[in-house]
């Protein structure tokens, strides 16, 4: 895709759930108006990009209500038609109704939600009753034709029960996307739930094994992305690419930020959609310069790393969270990324080069088939799925 562009729309930072490790909700947060949506469209008319993806995030985006999306989706779809807009949403599904589901289905909005495994694990991390409320919303979304995938947040506590969590996703037939609990720029105790990088790396290797063992019955999106990174030598999701200048978030009042993770923190405001800032103006703001400084830091600090092309130092937010807000290192999960990249790379090498050829006769050698699916089998599966 040429010149991809991602705009995260944060209708509100409010959220009815009380996840214990959450850093992106804010009580009493205002809700975005349709007028602000129109301002977003007008702002984007001055942005030269061929495609754009809009992700409704939060907080909890469904708090904006059915009327908001009934108006916002056609305004964006028609106003940004030249950019061929796609849509997505990240929601806990508590406020999903048949009415909202029909509105979202009309615009083919895929849903990302959050379940941390079996009910007791989920509720211990996200609050009593979370699991049942989300599953109720999931049923409504599914029955109205919406595609739903789940993010599973692994904390330093739940990672100890990884086998139960994988078994849950396998039995439910859910596509799994892993998210490690992260330190936060907003928290007074940022590491209370955070998964340590070394443990995260070992978890990724475990999930690689599980994805390959259950290759025909389970999909783990992170493993797909990581294998694609190593195989193509290019990052395929925002964590492993230079996101600065191609990803922005718009808060409820129209303020523009480098990413949804910064929304609500005034020191990271880059501009406002009402002022129609150019990309150059946004990147010249203090927070824009900070993002570019991270890119420059990675070029120097990671210049000799063989994974730099498809890692790019990881996530800038993760890098700034421990300091806080200063660039003094790369993403702390560097240890985990190296661990899984090395593991995938070594398995690819073994699969492609280590096995001696078998003689098929007529001078035609054939590679010996592995006894169980490997990384190449996963790459073939992804290629067939498009």
Describe each region flagged by the PLM.
Residues 263-386:
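Flexible mid-to-C-terminal extensions adjoining Fe-S/redox cofactors in radical SAM and related proteins
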Residues 10, 128-135, 139-244, 249, ...:
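Radical SAM enzyme [4Fe-4S]-AdoMet core and its adjacent flexible, acidic
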Residues 11-18, 60-63, 302-304, 308-309:
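Cysteine-centered iron-sulfur cluster-binding motifs in ferredoxin-type domains/subunits
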């Amino acid at each position: 895709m040429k010149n991809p562009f991602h705009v995260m729309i944060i209708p509100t930072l409010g959220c009815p759930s009380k996840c214990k490790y959450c850093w992106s909700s804010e009580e009493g947060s205002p809700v975005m108006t349709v007028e602000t949506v129109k301002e977003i469209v007008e702002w984007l008319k001055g942005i030269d990009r061929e495609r754009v993806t809009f992700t409704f995030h939060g907080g909890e985006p469904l708090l904006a209500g059915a009327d908001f999306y009934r108006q916002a989706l056609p305004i964006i779809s028609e106003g940004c038609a030249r950019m061929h807009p796609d849509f997505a949403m990240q929601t806990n599904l508590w406020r999903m109704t048949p009415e909202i589901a029909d509105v979202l289905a009309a615009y083919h909005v895929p849903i990302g939600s959050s379940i941390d495994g079996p009910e007791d694990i989920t509720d211990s991390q996200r609050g009593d009753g979370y699991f049942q409320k989300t599953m109720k919303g999931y049923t409504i979304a599914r029955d109205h034709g919406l595609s739903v995938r789940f993010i599973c947040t692994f904390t330093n506590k739940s990672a100890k029960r990884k086998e139960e969590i994988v078994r849950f996703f396998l039995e439910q037939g859910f596509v799994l996307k892993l998210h490690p609990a992260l330190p936060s720029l907003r928290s007074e105790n940022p590491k209370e739930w955070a998964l340590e990088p070394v443990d995260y790396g070992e978890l990724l290797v475990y999930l690689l094994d599980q994805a390959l063992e259950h290759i025909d019955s389970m999909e783990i999106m992170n493993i797909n992305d990581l294998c694609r990174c190593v195989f193509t030598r290019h990052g395929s999701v925002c964590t492993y690419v230079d996101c600065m200048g191609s990803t922005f978030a718009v808060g409820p009042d129209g303020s523009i930020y480098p990413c949804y993770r910064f929304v609500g923190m005034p020191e990271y405001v880059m501009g406002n959609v009402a002022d129609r800032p150019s990309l150059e103006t946004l990147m010249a703001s203090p927070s824009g310069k900070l993002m570019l400084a991270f890119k420059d830091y990675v070029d120097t600090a990671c210049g000799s790393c063989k994974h730099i092309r498809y890692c790019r130092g990881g996530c800038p937010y993760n890098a700034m969270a421990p300091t806080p807000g200063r660039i003094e290192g790369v993403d702390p999960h560097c240890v985990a990324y190296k661990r899984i990249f090395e593991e995938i790379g070594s398995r690819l090498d073994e699969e492609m080069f280590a096995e001696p050829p078998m003689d098929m006769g007529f001078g035609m050698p054939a590679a010996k088939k592995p006894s169980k699916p490997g990384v190449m089998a996963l790459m073939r599966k992804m290629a067939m799925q498009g």
